[in-house]
Regions:
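Residue-identity detector for threonine
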Residues: 12-15, 58, 90
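Short Cys/His-centered divalent metal-binding micro-motifs
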Residues: 28, 72, 76-93
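Generic structural signal for short, solvent-exposed loop/turn connectors between secondary structure elements
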Residues: 1, 68, 92-93
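Short, charged surface segments at domain edges that flank catalytic/cofactor-binding sites
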Residues: 1-45
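Histidine-centered nuclease catalytic patch
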Residues: 27-76
């Protein structure tokens, strides 16, 4: 199965790196995965914490869409899932 390599997430990791801007954990490997409802596979980037737990790396909106942020590479940053959930729809300095 082919995987499209032009997603916003992949572009974010390629241009801005694979390290969470908040906690500094770094994505180490991609896993080919498929959501139960999806028709095609995608790659998820994972970091591994000191206890060996996998942590999904995400594309965060610096200015959340709910606050007027745009869907553009200039408004994206790499962030681990835990930090992204904690940030929610806030704007950090």
């Amino acid at each position: 199965d082919l995987i499209k390599g032009n997603s916003q997430r992949y572009q974010t990791f390629f241009t801005k790196g694979c390290k969470c801007v908040k906690c500094g954990i770094e994505g180490k490997y991609f896993a080919k995965e498929k959501d139960l409802r999806a028709k095609s596979y995608h790659l998820n980037l994972y970091a591994v914490d000191d206890d060996g737990n996998e942590i999904l790396m995400t594309k965060d909106h610096i200015i959340p869409r709910s606050k007027g942020g745009i869907d553009d590479i200039s408004n994206y940053q790499p962030m681990c899932e835990l930090c992204n959930k904690a940030k929610g729809n806030t704007i950090e300095n």
